[in-house]
A protein has these predicted regions:
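Glycine-rich phosphate/pyrophosphate-binding loop regions near the starts of catalytic domains
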Residues: 13, 18-170, 176
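Short Gly/Ser/Thr- and Asp/Glu-enriched loop/turn motifs at secondary-structure junctions
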Residues: 43-44, 265-270
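Short amphipathic alpha-helices in soluble, non-transmembrane regions
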Residues: 282-292
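Active-site-proximal betaalpha loop/short-helix elements
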Residues: 101-103, 194-267
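Helix N-cap motif at beta-to-alpha junctions
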Residues: 275-281
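N-terminal amphipathic/basic leader segments beginning at the initiator methionine
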Residues: 1-30, 321-332
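Phosphate/diphosphate-binding glycine-rich loops and adjacent basic-rich segments that engage nucleotide
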Residues: 152-201, 313-314, 334
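Acidic, Ser/Thr/Pro-rich beta/coil linker or hinge segments at domain junctions
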Residues: 290-336
Length: 336
């Protein structure tokens, strides 16, 4: 049974930013009715427009600005690029809007702009337009970034083509970005040596012409929320195997200490792919061939023999099946 909600709140709460059920309710009840059109159907990470163009937009409010493995600049580039990649598009161009708080150190801004330049070069995209605004001290938190991305369509995600037996490929270990950002805040006095996985996913582009059915980058809400949302769209269930899901030892240890389930932690350089059963082995090998994908695993499958249609099930280490729900409240605010 899916979670129910309390009456509509009068104010937006921080929990809405989780990327889970509360965010989905806000979108369904307020945003989609205001702008409903065919391009928004299914809430894609990027919309496919006439002329073979894909278009996406994103906002970044991460706190702190700098964290092990990256900063708000690398995050802005890679987050936008990855939304295009998993939508079946080769990234080409970005826009960049900066909202600066009065008092921001110009040295920090210079460092972030350098990160943006390097990340864009690595992802083979160009920043071609932008805007800059400055607000009074206290009216923003140092720096916010808003991007848009344009790419060339080379494949089309199609949840409607997913069939029982299709395999789920996870491209790498979970949770590294969320925990790197959280530990960088210093709130818990932990030093787990965790680095963000923030990186572009361009190496997955060849999987589209090879027959990948569907992809998503694992951002807010984590793997469990993303696959729950996929399962809800299918006339089948989705099963993932706990013993196949890669989680690094530092992430697992820190998550256990903090009482956090890694299945709900965000990444910024990982994706989950639905592959046809006959092509899954070749696709897994292709992912593992790239340094970012060397720890990729087949973690489960689409099935009609376990659970009910629309459910996401975890085959646990103890041998049982556990129903996984989408995230309902914020675990770690402002991680992207």
């Amino acid at each position: 049974m899916r979670a129910s909600f309390s009456p509509e709140p009068e104010r937006i709460s921080l929990e809405v930013g989780s990327g889970g059920l509360l965010m989905r309710r806000l979108i369904d009840r307020h945003i989609l009715p205001a702008f409903s059109n065919p391009y928004l159907r299914g809430l894609p990470d990027a919309s496919h427009l006439p002329g073979g163009i894909a278009f996406t937009t994103d906002g970044f409010v991460v706190d702190p600005l700098f964290f092990p493995g990256g900063d708000i600049g690398t995050l802005a580039v890679n987050g936008t690029v990855n939304d295009l990649v998993v939508s079946g598009a080769r990234p080409e161009f970005l826009s960049l809007a900066l909202i600066l708080e009065e008092g921001l150190a110009t040295a920090d801004l210079a460092k972030i702009l350098s990160s943006i330049r390097k990340a864009a070069a690595k992802a083979r995209v160009r920043v071609v337009t932008g805007d800059t605004k400055v607000v009074r001290r206290g009216q923003a938190d140092k720096l916010y970034i808003v991007t848009a991305g344009v790419g060339r369509v080379i494949g089309r995600p199609a949840a409607a083509k997913i069939r029982p037996g299709d395999k789920l490929i996870l491209t790498g270990p979970l949770g590294e970005h969320s925990l790197a950002v959280m530990l960088a805040r210093g709130d818990f006095g932990l030093a787990a040596g965790v680095k963000s996985d923030c990186a572009p996913l361009n190496f997955l582009l060849p999987l589209w012409p090879q027959g990948a059915r569907w992809m998503r980058d694992i951002t807010r809400g984590g793997l469990a929320t993303i696959l729950s949302e996929l399962a809800e769209r299918l006339p089948f269930s989705v099963r993932i195997d706990e013993d196949k899901i890669p989680v690094s030892r530092p992430v697992r240890g820190a998550a256990e200490l903090l009482g956090i389930d890694p299945l709900y932690l965000a990444c910024e350089g990982r994706a989950v792919i639905v592959a046809p059963i006959k092509k899954a082995g070749r696709m897994l090998a292709a992912v593992r061939h790239h340094p970012q994908g060397r720890k990729a695993e087949i973690i489960g499958e689409v099935t009609k023999t376990a659970g009910r249609p629309g459910e996401l099930l975890l085959a646990t280490l103890a041998g049982g099946l556990r129903l996984l729900e989408p995230l309902t409240s914020e675990i770690l605010p402002r991680i992207c």
